[in-house]
Structure formats: structure tokens, C-alpha cells
UniProtKB/Swiss-Prot annotation:
This is Histone H2B.3. One of its GO terms (cellular component) is nucleosome. The lineage of its organism: Eukaryota, Viridiplantae, Streptophyta, Embryophyta, Tracheophyta. Can be acetylated to form H2BK6ac, H2BK33ac and H2BK34ac. Monoubiquitinated by BRE1 to form H2BK143ub1 and deubiquitinated by UBP26. Required for heterochromatic histone H3 di- and trimethylation at H3K4me. May give a specific tag for epigenetic transcriptional activation. It is found in: Nucleus; Chromosome. Its main location: nucleus.
Length: 151
């Protein structure tokens, strides 16, 4: 029990020194405010963030949505299309174009030619698209090419 009594006076002594330490801490507090005054770094970071926002440019994604809508209005003026269906149609057209481009590039390689001409595209259309769809696509394609060359 004697050690307990010894601890109590020891605890009181630091408590008595605490006000003196608080004065020292209070004296040091203005010295610590200097780094607080140096908080210009976050403000600079904010202005740097604003500059980064100015540098950010929307990534332009090319879609066929406008053209799909125009064709829909030509065929069925009274019918609309949902955004989900429009996305499906857009991905469908991208897939078809990719298949046609791959087939046309294969044909150009087989014939050892460095360029893809309208002939390779026409043959690729006949190979990729089935039956009547290929015939209609070829006729529309030749019509578009003749219109382009005549103008």
C-alpha cells in the first residue's frame, strides 16, 4: 500500500506542472500557426484542379444513332425507338461494318493488292450478307458510288 501512496503524490506533482506546461504550449501555439498560414498549397491544388478540368475534353464517340433515326422516320414516320433499342442497332451496324472490313482486307491480301477498292467491298458484302439482303446491298452500293462519281 505504500507504493500507492507514493504514486498519488507523484501524480499530483505533474498536475501542478501542467499549468506551466500549458503556458509553454500556449507560447508555442503562435509558432505552430506559421505552417497553418502556409496552407496555400491546397489553394494552389484547387486552382490546379480547375486547370485540369479545363484540360478535360469529352471523349467523342461516333455513333450511327442520328442516321438510324433518319432511316426509321423515312420508313415509319409514326414510330419511335427506345434508347436501348438504339444502342442495339448501333452495335449491330458496328459489327456488320467490322465484318465487312475484315473480309475486304482478306480479299485484298489474297490478291496481293495494297488498297481496298469498291470491288473488294462488293465481294465482301456478297460473302458476309445472306441472299436477297446481299443483292439489295450491292445494288444500293453501286447506286451510291455512281452518284458520288457523277457529282
Amino acid at each position: 500500500m505504500a507504493p500507492k501512496a507514493g504514486k498519488k503524490p507523484a501524480e499530483k506533482k505533474p498536475a501542478e506542472k501542467a499549468p506551466a506546461e500549458e503556458e509553454k504550449v500556449a507560447e508555442k501555439a503562435p509558432a505552430e500557426k506559421k505552417p497553418k498560414a502556409g496552407k496555400k498549397l491546397p489553394k494552389e491544388a484547387v486552382t490546379g484542379g480547375v486547370e485540369k478540368k479545363k484540360k478535360r475534353v469529352k471523349k467523342s464517340t461516333e455513333t450511327y444513332k442520328i442516321y438510324i433515326f433518319k432511316v426509321l422516320k423515312q420508313v415509319h414516320p409514326d414510330i419511335g425507338i427506345s434508347s436501348k433499342a438504339m444502342g442495339i442497332m448501333n452495335s449491330f451496324i458496328n459489327d456488320i461494318f467490322e465484318k465487312l472490313a475484315q473480309e475486304a482486307s482478306k480479299l485484298a491480301r489474297y490478291n496481293k493488292k495494297p488498297t481496298i477498292t469498291s470491288r473488294e467491298i462488293q465481294t465482301a458484302v456478297r460473302l458476309v450478307l445472306p441472299g436477297e439482303l446481299a443483292k439489295h446491298a450491292v445494288s444500293e452500293g453501286t447506286k451510291a458510288v455512281t452518284k458520288f462519281t457523277s457529282s
